[in-house]
UniProtKB/Swiss-Prot annotation:
Cofactor requirement: Zn(2+)
Lineage: Bacteria, Pseudomonadati, Spirochaetota, Spirochaetia, Spirochaetales
Enzyme Commission numbers on file: 3.1.26.11
Catalytic activity: Endonucleolytic cleavage of RNA, removing extra 3' nucleotides from tRNA precursor, generating 3' termini of tRNAs. A 3'-hydroxy group is left at the tRNA terminus and a 5'-phosphoryl group is left at the trailer molecule
Known function: Zinc phosphodiesterase, which displays some tRNA 3'-processing endonuclease activity. Probably involved in tRNA maturation, by removing a 3'-trailer from precursor tRNA.
Name by which UniProt lists this protein: Ribonuclease Z
Subunit structure: Homodimer.
NCBIfam families noted in UniProt: PRK00055.1-3 (NF000801), RNase_Z (TIGR02651)
Binding note for cofactor: Binds 2 Zn(2+) ions.
Catalytic residues identified in the record: 66 (proton acceptor)
Keywords: Endonuclease, Hydrolase, Metal-binding, Nuclease, tRNA processing, Zinc
Length: 319
């Protein structure tokens, strides 16, 4: 299955020597989608030997520095790589993302040899579906932070089941366009008889659902957007002893993150966006322990810089 999730960074506020700022990249059927682009994201791409030229879309959650300061560098890198990029780059984010980037491009006189397509989200007005093709769709949800902030949902479409050649032949369905339409999930009329895909296709293969959620305070409705998702990468900025600070700063504790995914019956939960105060492994494992105590059957793990998750049937395997 051609579906990988790469963890480029896991920290909040500022990068550390062993922890870059929170950023996640999806590789899906030869194309890449980048979620957030803080300082040093470019370094993570280099370390993990990921081609920036394959990035077709960059989705920014909000206009705080630790989520956008690497964006200009990526745009410049794409332009300076031998003038080979021909595909447009789509950048999605809240109102202001275009002004932020275009102002910097103008001031620094950046030469671009490719088109940037901006899609600025007006929360509660922009339609939830941001992008859709035959394989997938990308939606946004409103989060609760000190400025406009967006969570992203990557939803793979269901796939038709295996084509039963013997059944097709027994129904005298000829090879060619009619079989192709059935394989694509469409009904056909053959010799006056309606044939539905379920007659010759095996069980539908459910598509995978992934969510990227940071930065946000806890709110009840959040779990409704990610019901039964296969994997949710969600901020876990603080341990529970700092829950009041988390509430004040509109962030989550690891325990609250687990409450959200437990309520949503999420299959796998990845914790991310750790406070810079947690520099020791024991601090991070305390975060993990608090989340696991809240959701013991939640398949909860710590996201780590350089981690790669590979889709395997209905779950993601950490490589």
């Amino acid at each position: 299955m051609n579906f990988n999730i790469n963890i480029l960074g896991t920290g909040g506020t500022r990068p550390l020597h062993n922890r870059y700022l929170t950023s996640v990249l999806i590789e899906y059927h030869g194309e890449s989608i980048l979620f957030d682009c803080g300082e040093a994201t470019q370094m993570s791409l280099r370390k993990q030997k990921i081609s920036w030229q394959k990035i077709k879309m960059i989705c920014i959650t909000h206009l705080h520095a630790d989520h956008i300061t690497g964006l200009l560098g990526i745009v410049m890198l794409m332009a300076q790589s031998g003038d080979t990029r021909k595909e447009p780059l789509t950048i999605i984010g809240p109102i202001g993302i275009k002004k932020y980037l275009e102002t910097n491009i103008e001031l620094l006189r950046v030469h671009k040899n490719y088109q940037i397509i901006y899609k600025e989200i007006i929360i509660n007005k922009t339609e939830p579906v941001l992008y859709e093709d035959k394989r997938k769709r990308i939606e946004y949800i409103k989060l609760k932070h000190s400025i406009d902030c967006i969570g992203y949902l990557f939803i793979e479409k269901d796939k038709p089941g295996k084509f039963d050649t013997q059944k097709a032949e027994s129904l005298n369905i000829p090879k060619g366009p009619i079989r192709k339409k059935l394989q694509e999930g469409y009904e056909v009329i053959l010799n006056g008889r309606k044939i539905v895909p379920s007659e010759i296709l095996g069980e539908i293969k459910k598509g995978l659902k992934f969510a990227y959620i940071t930065d946000t305070a806890y709110f009840e409705e959040l779990s409704t957007y990610i019901q039964n998702f296969n994997l949710v990468i969600i901020e876990s900025t603080f341990k529970d002893d700092l829950k009041e600070e988390a509430k004040k700063k509109l962030h989550l504790t690891a325990k609250l993150a687990a409450q959200i995914t437990k309520k949503a019956k999420v299959y796998q939960t990845g914790l991310i966006h750790f406070s810079e105060r947690y520099t020791l492994n024991k601090d991070l494992y305390e975060l993990l322990n608090e989340a696991q105590q809240e959701y013991p059957n939640g398949n909860i793990f710590l996201a780590k810089d350089g981690m790669k998750l590979k889709a395997n049937k209905d779950k993601f395997i950490i490589k």
